[in-house]
């Protein structure tokens, strides 16, 4: 009988998976991790009820990059990720695009989400007050509703619509 210790290989594989699923700038889940989460949920339909998502979009990241440089833009992205993470502690957070984030709201109630959004707004205001530009995070959320949604895709589309409505209100 030959026994081989594969502990190091297992740990290395786990470390590579964590690295593969993390956004290098913010440390939150990346688009690949987000897509894996959605694939998992779609292949386990019993997990879909109760699913919810908060879509977040940073206001004027391109303008910040153009006017103040990419270092300042990167700081804006990192600080925004921290703000979102602090407003929704323990909730999975993903950066799915340059200025787009998604929070998985499973297990949270309407009141918790509202409190999280308010905390986010206060933190963004404090960040803006001490900065050379006006930071902003537009956010919209939706929970899976069997009366409205045929899939998680339609739940995400509703959250995205609410986020763009908020973004429009913030600009006007």
List PLM regions with ranges.
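PAS-family sensory domains
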Residues: 1-5, 158
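PAS-associated C-terminal cap
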Residues: 4-14, 18, 30
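Catalytic-core segments of nucleotide cyclases and related cyclic-nucleotide turnover enzymes
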Residues: 9, 70, 114-121, 125, ...
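Conserved long alpha-helical elements within nucleotide-processing catalytic cores of c-di-GMP signaling
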Residues: 17-21, 29-52, 59-86, 94-98, ...
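A structural signal for short, well-ordered beta-strand segments
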Residues: 53, 101, 137-141
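Short beta-strand-to-loop capping motifs
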Residues: 103-108, 143-145
């Amino acid at each position: 009988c030959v026994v081989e210790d594969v502990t190091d290989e297992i740990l290395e594989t786990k470390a590579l998976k964590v690295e593969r699923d993390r956004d290098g700038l913010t440390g939150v889940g990346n688009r690949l991790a987000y897509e894996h989460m959605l694939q998992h949920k779609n292949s386990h339909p019993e997990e879909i009820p109760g699913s919810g998502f908060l879509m977040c979009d940073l206001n004027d990241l391109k303008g910040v990059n153009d006017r103040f440089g990419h270092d300042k833009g990167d700081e804006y992205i990192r600080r925004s990720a921290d703000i979102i993470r602090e407003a929704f502690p323990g909730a999975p957070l993903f950066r799915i695009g340059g200025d787009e984030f998604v929070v998985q709201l499973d297990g949270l109630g309407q009141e918790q989400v509202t409190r999280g959004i308010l905390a986010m707004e206060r933190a963004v205001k404090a960040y803006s007050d001490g900065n050379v530009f006006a930071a902003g995070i537009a956010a919209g959320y939706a929970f899976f509703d069997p009366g409205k949604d045929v899939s998680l895709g339609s739940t995400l589309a509703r959250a995205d619509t609410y986020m763009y409505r908020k973004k429009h209100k913030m600009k006007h």
